[in-house]
Amino acid sequence: MPSASGHHQIPAETQRHDDDQTQETAQGLSAAAMLAQEQADDLDAILDDIETVLETNAEEYVSSFVQKGGE
């Protein structure tokens, strides 16, 4: 029904349902953002480990791929 201002009023039950869906969506997005951040942190840790190994053992690492004596 139009209100005095000419706008249709939304039934309270529908409004509560929409509010619940909005809250669930926000919680889902928040959980997804947290998971994405955790995955990014894990990836950063792995890349840091690789970088450390390469810095400390770079010569050994490279020599393991270099052919010796024309092999």
Swiss-Prot record:
Pfam families: Pup (PF05639). Residues 23-56 form a coiled coil. Residues 1-30 are annotated as: Disordered. There is a cross-link at E71 (Isoglutamyl lysine isopeptide (Glu-Lys) (interchain with K-? in acceptor proteins)). It comes from the Bacteria. GO terms for molecular function: proteasome binding; protein tag activity. One of its GO terms (biological process) is protein pupylation. The keyword Coiled coil applies. NCBIfam families: pupylate_cterm. HAMAP family: Pup. Protein modifier that is covalently attached to lysine residues of substrate proteins, thereby targeting them for proteasomal degradation. The tagging system is termed pupylation. Strongly interacts with the proteasome-associated ATPase ARC through a hydrophobic interface; the interacting region of Pup lies in its C-terminal half. There is one Pup binding site per ARC hexamer ring. Belongs to the prokaryotic ubiquitin-like protein family. This is Prokaryotic ubiquitin-like protein Pup.
